[in-house]
Design a protein with these regions (language model features):
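Ser/Thr-rich low-complexity repeats and stalk/linker segments
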Residues: 35-87
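Primarily recognizes the serine-hydrolase "nucleophile elbow" in alpha/beta-hydrolase
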Residues: 163-167, 207-247
Length: 247
């Protein structure tokens, strides 16, 4: 009897890239429970779905709806987006976690004990992307640049927590955009709270971006979630050098 197998089209991929997971050589018609476990930043996450193998003993996760699990409809990435946080102790993330691929362990177990598994690596920072600290001209943040000329540039704003959410800039640069993760409070040298933030500081950031030789006359956008989304809308309505807003 052939041992059950698990395969995937991309073992290493960007965090937002779809992958196709296939299970083969399970007993035909058998139910197969698939578990995907990962540690992301400081928490452990897990998703689970049960499928029925077809007459050839195959399960195509991208094309089959699970019989049960943490998601219910056909979804190629269901085992990723439906993951639930496990009640484990907090794990200390790597110091440079944005630069560090994280692993997702996929395990499939048939009702009669057949097993297969694989490990995937997910990346926030694509090949050739560079990251540099910006602490000049009154600005604090991270600048992410893609290899080659950028398609456009984005000023990335954090939300009400005041953190510099590097992963957004890393992902944008991995898709060809220059991204400046701009801090505007709760960082050294900046206001402690989200009060009385002068708009002039954002004008300074926009002018700084426009001076960069790689930007030229390319589009400059601003993006932010949560309270950062409110700020992005305000900046787009205030400064004509902002060409696009996502909030």
């Amino acid at each position: 009897m052939t041992a059950a197998r698990a395969s995937v089209d991309h073992r290493v991929a960007l965090a937002d890239q779809d992958v196709q997971i296939e299970l083969t050589d399970f007993p035909p018609g058998e139910t197969v429970t698939v578990t995907a476990t990962q540690v992301f930043r400081s928490s452990r996450w897990q998703a689970q779905a049960t499928f029925r193998a077809d007459a050839a003993g195959r399960v195509s996760i991208a094309r089959q709806a699970p019989l049960s699990g943490t998601y219910t409809d056909v979804s190629p990435m269901g085992l990723f987006w439906s993951a639930e946080r496990l009640p484990d102790p907090i794990v200390r993330p790597p110091d440079d976690w944005v630069l560090t691929p994280w692993q997702i362990r996929v395990e499939a177990i048939g009702q009669d004990g057949a097993r297969a598994g694989l490990v995937l690596a997910r990346l926030l920072l694509g090949p050739g992307v560079t990251r540099q600290v910006v602490r000049s001209d009154g600005l604090v943040g991270w600048l992410f640049l893609p290899p080659g000329e950028p398609k456009a540039a984005v000023i990335v704003l954090g939300g009400g927590g005041g953190a510099i959410d590097e992963y957004w800039g890393a992902m944008l640069a991995s898709h060809g955009y220059a991204a400046f993760n701009l801090a505007y409070f709760n960082q050294p040298g900046l206001p402690r709270g989200l009060v009385n933030i002068p708009l002039e500081s954002f004008d300074n950031a926009i002018r700084w971006m426009r001076r960069q030789p790689w930007l030229g006359d390319r589009l400059l956008a601003v993006w932010g979630p949560s309270r950062g989304g409110e700020l992005a809308l305000l900046l787009g309505a205030t400064f004509p050098d902002i060409n696009a807003v996502a909030a």
